Amino acid sequence: MDTLAQLTQEHDALRILLERIEAAAEARDAVALSASLQAARAALTSDLDAHISVEEAEAFSPIAETLGAGLVAPFYEEHVEIRATRDDVYARLERDEAPYAQALRLCDLILAHQQREDMMLFPSAREAVFR
C-alpha cells in the first residue's frame, strides 16, 4: 500500500472515533465523552503523532519539493493546532472537567483537515508527485 493510501485509511479509522466523541460532546454527556476520549486516547496521542510524522516526512516533504511549500504550509500549521487542542482536551479531562467545546473543536479541526487532505491535497499529489 502506498503512503497516501495508508494515510487515508488511517483517516477513515480515526473518523469513526471522532464521530463518537463529537456525538457525546454535542449531547453534553460527560460520562460518554470521558469514555469516548479514553477509548480514543492511543489513537489521538501516540498513533496520531506517528501519523503526523509519516505525513510530514513522506507526503508533505515530497509535495512541497514538487508543488511548492505554500501548498502544504497550512497543513503543517493545522498539525500544530490539532496537537495543542488535543493536549488541552486531555489536560481538562485529567482535571475531571468535561471539555465539551474543546472536544468539538478538536473533532472539527481533525475532520476538516482530513477532508482537505483526502479530497484535495492527496489526489493532486498522487497525480503530480507519487505517480
Q: Model regions: which residues?
A:
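Small-residue-biased structural context
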Residues: 1-131
